């Protein structure tokens, strides 16, 4: 099913770039504007890119770790990690290749956010042969992709109950469904009954608070914990880490002093910087702007 979704995305990208006005969208999407980057703040751009990497790859919450534990020992973890990163980047690139040029073709503002997929794509499908069929299939596959993402995110919680508590999968899933429903209520009520609760000032809501806690707190702190655990002798240690990463057949992670130094000292520092900048940006915006602009 995901292969079919990928195939439809390729067809959509081909169709979109042939629309009138799509060329300007391609320029907007593919040609970097370094002047605007400097005006916005290079530090802010880098921070936003790193934050997106945390989010899109589910770093810091153990999802990749759990799925990595499910693959056979003969597989190369290095190769699988590069494959996941490459495929994720390719899909994101294709999505941009579809949405941004379509915005220019249909005179839409490209900065409107995720909802653009439901605005631009129906227009694209309307101009394609068998567009209704392709559109129905695309949004159906998108729904299943979203569901599979939800399953992936909560697999580590389900696995926790199964591995450490000996709970059956069916019971662990049922417990998590109940917990998700209860914990999701404040977010849902934040747009009506709890709309008066504005944690970050006027215009903010419960969803903004939860997004900040996950994106700016749990993901970077979780990633920092994993990095320190894998590289510190108080945790797993680099020797055990390299042994596990380079087990199996295929691509190996180079075991040299430069990479070891990077993993042990530079990488934790970068993750810590992402965490600190997220809080400074939220709670000390004037100081943040003076530094990064």
Language model segments and positions:
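A generic transmembrane alpha-helix motif of multi-pass inner-membrane proteins
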Residues: 199-228, 252-293
